[in-house]
């Protein structure tokens, strides 16, 4: 796939992105493909999962209010690790934008308000962008200008799957994911499976999302001013 990110962003890919995220979190994020930060501190992150074609027929099972209770519990599970790494801990989580299925761009959007122990708050927006053979997860955090919903919606516009790999290109006989979009969303958020039998591979996603990984903006700004790239030594 291709991601059209403005030239105003500083971009890290692969191992460079992994190194930066590890420095500030103390946790490996070796699945990240692209990390980008804009001039005003806004942040993007993208990674792809080769799951097969994700169906959307279980979307009616999604219950945002029920999800939120478990989301809060799961985010707080990460607090012990964050404390060990000298990071602020999660105090509360609420919906900024409840999960929304966009049939035009074959994407799911949602955003969370996160309150921290240092009396700050952030908004983390996410998009699950569906393709023929899997899906791309995009994440967005606002910078100096605050959270802007249009920036979240833009995740599915600046990301383009390669020709014949878009969601609409699916054909009978192609690989189909073991779970639908509702169950995938639940797993991504760290919520219990909507129905029994969710695959173990899906549960591994919980490791990724129990940690709020977007970083203190002033530290990132200073780092990027020094160099466009920082590599692991």
Predicted features, each with a name:
Residues 7-13, 155-160:
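Short conserved aromatic/hydrophobic patches within beta-strands of well-structured domains
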Residues 6, 68, 72, 149-156:
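Extracytoplasmic/secreted envelope proteins and their assembly/folding machinery
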Residues 5-7, 42, 125, 134:
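Envelope-exposed proteins and targeting segments
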Residues 113-182:
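Extracytoplasmic/lumenal ectodomains and periplasmic regions of secretory and membrane proteins
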Residues 207-212:
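Hydrophobic alpha-helical transmembrane segments
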Residues 191, 213-228:
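Alpha-helical transmembrane segments
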Residues 1-2, 15-123, 173-190, 196-204:
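Conserved polar/disulfide-associated segments of primarily extracytoplasmic proteins
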Residues 171-178, 221-233:
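Juxtamembrane, membrane-proximal amphipathic segments and lipid-exposed surfaces
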